[in-house]
């Protein structure tokens, strides 16, 4: 891929990605952020035009750029300083909010608007005006980068242009450090402070702004230091306006090929992508995208995407639950009711799992190993100890289930009754009752139920009547 196509493609994508954050901050009236994004948009657009015109081998014979380059070189000077000023203004506002030592002006108040405009635009506009004094030529044209400032290599260039980038980047770094200190000091009250100061920020928005400012400072501060040092190394001679603005060379358009794009293009692209990643992917921005798509009758796209996400989510959750359940399944070696369970044992899977005859194919067997006779005697003792238990069982709606809860009074953990009694109680208190239950349930274990109780009571009444009869 050539430099031309790379620059045009990356800058065009940056312009598209900067549109949503610009719309959002315009809605929230965040003036420093609006100015910052505007600078980045302007620089990306100029990079697209310059790369499209002056990137080919015949760039020397292309348009000389009169009019266009006169404007662009001023915007370049303003953007290099204006980005640092806007970021510093954002951090200054965050510091003011966190300090909470005075009442904050309303976002729509002229005091707030004027202060933000002065901090963000005064220095860039001033340097844009003074840059005319520093120009040796009207402008120059570099391959790939297009219009470029050609400034006088004297001390006045350092004073009127280069040092301001470093100053504002340094001020921004200092305020960023102060914000971190105040944030740590008041970390427990930050949420309340943001709410009570009428700042229009919540904790998430505050964190995004702070992270963004730190990243931009980490980019701009080294860049400003590098530019300042490089400028100092080139300082020579004395400045005179007459020699700098010589009428014989002023209108000469210098065209040169640096061999590759100058690094400031990549800085603009990088910062543009950072703006989108931090401000363009938040919940507020996503809600704005949704609202916009529905306003242009494209809401069905969101609905399709939502259904797709929900479907995949359910599928992933199902797979996860299956994996978890397969790990937790284990066979109880003390289970004896093999008739009631299906064996899911396979040759490649061990241990096998006994499951009830149901769609779920899961069971939990709470019974513990014990002497069957002793367990049955204990069960018999507590089951028929008094009539209160029977009364409780009568009040329980068992519907058609054979397995009923069994409630006893005063049972302790020393009682060795089967824990499976919470779902079913196997009883064998008499051989006759056992045989009767076995015939009724066709080989299954006898389960105590109201039906069996009624049958027993009716049989007892019938036998007593026979005994009492003549």
Curated annotation (Swiss-Prot):
Protein's cellular compartments: Membrane
Keywords assigned: G-protein coupled receptor, Membrane, Pheromone response, Receptor, Transducer, Transmembrane, Transmembrane helix
Residues spanning the membrane: 6-23, 30-53, 71-98, 117-134, 156-183, 206-228, 267-285
Region (Hydrophilic): 300-470
Primary residence: membrane
GO cellular component: endoplasmic reticulum; plasma membrane; vacuolar lumen
Extracellular side: 1-5, 54-70, 135-155, 229-266
Membrane topology summary: Multi-pass membrane protein
GO molecular function, one term: mating-type a-factor pheromone receptor activity
Region Disordered: start-end pairs: 440-470
One GO-annotated biological process of the protein: pheromone-dependent signal transduction involved in conjugation with cellular fusion
Cytoplasmic side: 24-29, 99-116, 184-205, 286-470
PANTHER family in UniProt: PHEROMONE A FACTOR RECEPTOR
Function text: Receptor for the peptide pheromone a factor.
Stated family: Belongs to the G-protein coupled receptor 4 family.
Protein name: Pheromone a factor receptor
Taxonomic source organism: Saccharomyces cerevisiae (strain ATCC 204508 / S288c)
Gene label: STE3
């Amino acid at each position: 891929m050539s430099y031309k196509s790379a620059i045009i493609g990356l800058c065009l994508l940056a312009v598209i990605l900067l549109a949503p954050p610009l719309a959002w901050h315009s809605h929230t009236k965040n003036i420093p952020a609006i100015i910052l994004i505007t600078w980045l948009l302007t620089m990306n657009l100029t990079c697209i035009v310059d790369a499209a015109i002056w990137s080919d081998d015949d760039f020397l014979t292309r348009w000389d750029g009169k009019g266009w380059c006169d404007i662009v070189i001023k915007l370049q000077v303003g953007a290099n300083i204006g980005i640092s000023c806007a970021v510093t203004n954002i951090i200054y506002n965050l510091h003011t909010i966190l300090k909470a030592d005075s009442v904050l002006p309303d976002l729509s108040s002229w005091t707030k608007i004027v202060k933000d405009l002065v901090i963000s635009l005064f220095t860039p506009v001033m340097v844009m005006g003074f840059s005319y004094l520093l120009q040796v030529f009207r402008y120059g044209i570099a391959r790939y980068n297009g219009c470029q400032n050609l400034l006088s290599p004297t001390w006045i260039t350092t004073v009127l242009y280069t040092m301001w980038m470093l100053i504002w980047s340094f001020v921004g770094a200092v305020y960023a450090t102060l914000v971190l200190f105040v944030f740590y000091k008041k970390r427990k009250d930050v949420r309340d402070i943001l709410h009570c100061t009428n700042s229009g920020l919540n904790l998430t928005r505050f964190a995004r702004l702070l992270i963004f400012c730190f990243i931009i400072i980490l980019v701009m501060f080294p860049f400003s230091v590098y530019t300042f040092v490089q400028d100092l190394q080139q300082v020579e001679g004395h400045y005179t306006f007459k020699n700098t603005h010589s009428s014989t060379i002023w209108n000469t358009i210098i065209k040169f090929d640096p061999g590759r794009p100058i690094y400031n293009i990549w800085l603009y692209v990088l910062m543009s992508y950072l703006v989108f990643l931090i401000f363009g992917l938040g919940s507020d921005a996503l809600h704005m995208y949704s609202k916009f798509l529905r306003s242009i009758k494209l809401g069905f796209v969101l609905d399709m995407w939502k259904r797709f996400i929900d479907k995949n989510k359910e599928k992933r959750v199902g797979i996860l639950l299956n994996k978890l359940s397969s790990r937790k399944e284990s066979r109880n070696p003390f289970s004896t009711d093999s008739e009631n369970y299906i064996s899911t044992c396979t040759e490649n899977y061990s241990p096998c799992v006994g499951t009830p005859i149901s769609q779920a194919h899961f069971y939990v067997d709470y019974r513990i190993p014990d002497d069957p006779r002793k367990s049955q005697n204990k069960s018999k003792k507590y089951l028929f100890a008094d009539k209160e238990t029977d009364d409780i069982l009568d009040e329980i709606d068992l519907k058609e289930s054979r397995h009923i809860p069994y409630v006893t009074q005063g049972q302790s953990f020393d009682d060795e009754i089967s824990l499976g009694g919470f779902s079913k109680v196997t009883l064998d208190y008499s051989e006759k009752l056992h045989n009767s239950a076995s015939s009724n349930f066709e080989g299954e274990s006898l389960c105590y139920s109201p039906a069996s109780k009624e049958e027993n009571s009716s049989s007892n009444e019938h036998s007593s009547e026979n005994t009492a009869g003549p």
